[in-house]
Amino acid sequence: MPLYRKLLGVSAAAALTASVTRARREARRRAIELGAPFGVLPTLPTGQAQRVGVVYNPSKPGAAAAVEILERILAANGHPQALVRTTRVDEPGSEAARELIAEGVDLLIAAGGDGTVRAVAAALAHHEGRKPRLGILPMGTGNLLARNLYIPVSDVAACVNIALNGAGQAVDAIEMTTTSAPGEETEHTFFVMSGAGFDALVMNDTNEEIKAKFGWVAYVQSGMKHMLGRSHPVRISVDGAPFRTLPMRSVLIANCGRLQGGIRLADMTDVHDGNLEVIVASPRDLVEWGLLMAKVTRRTILGSPRVELPVIRHLVGSEVVLEFPDGAQPVEVDGDPAPSAHRISARVLPAAVEVAVHPEVL
């Protein structure tokens, strides 16, 4: 057999093995995420006693009850009583987190929605010196960081067990600056995904009553309303490269890519690889929206290799600058509204936070 055929055979076998390994790993992670409510996820062995701090959002249904469950588990396993702080309308959790870090807690738990988790994690990311591990009790609609770490969002006891006894996963942060006008800059730190254009319109125009009753369905309703808007140019520079101009309906900066329902939007980056992914979507009509959705669905269900389409482009690097020549675009940060901007810059902060996850996820 010619050498080139042998090499092709070896390459094909290696690719198949890698694909099967990835599929098995993803299936195991999904089993952890989905199996906990049905008793499939075994309780992890109890570790040594820890000083636990909790920041929770009292406006979230079930948050206070979750803290009570946490305190019962702590008492039953010989841990000291938790130090508990609440968020406020004018203080989403960063200040409370800094207080608990100063108290010297070993584990800092964020109990709330994506905003609370982001605020607590951001305080950890920017802390100089010893950092406690972050635990997550997801109580929101999206719970996106928890989903990307395969934390079982519907089982409080399992989340507490993972927070107390899980393994540590290093997670990158993304530091982003939005410029609304000359001299008007806003700093943000996020951990999942932020964007400008269509997705920000959807997030900013979501009906809160529908969201409270039906969860992510509210985003679908808002998305249908804004689906057929016009494109705008965006100038993009990744890692200091020359600017390139692309049409866009939406541009996203992603630290990781799983959304509700396991949908994977970003497919070139992960939470701990030191990179961010820029996704530029430019569908002009219902047919092109269909192509975009088909690509995302194929990737989500089949784990298919990335397929380039004219309506969606992916760029990867450690920093990016976006400029909008047509004027300021609406912006969202991990699903929360932010000031509109005509310029956005972002860079990765590698391994900024250590998050407690189930050991099988690593």
Where are each of the predicted segments found?
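ATP/NTP phosphate-donor binding region
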Residues: 2-108
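ATP/nucleoside-binding phosphotransfer catalytic cores, i.e., glycine-rich phosphate-binding loops
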Residues: 2-24, 35-40, 238-245, 264, ...
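Short hydrophobic-aromatic micro-motifs
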Residues: 16, 183, 187-195, 201, ...
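Nucleotide donor/acceptor-binding cores
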Residues: 50, 132, 318
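Oxyanion-binding "anion nests"
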Residues: 76, 230-275
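Catalytic core of DAGKc-family lipid kinases
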Residues: 87, 126-250
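N-terminal glycine-rich "phosphate-gripper" loop used for MgATP/nucleotide binding
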Residues: 110-115
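Short Gly/Thr/Asp-enriched flexible loops that form oxyanion-binding sites at enzyme active sites
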Residues: 116-129
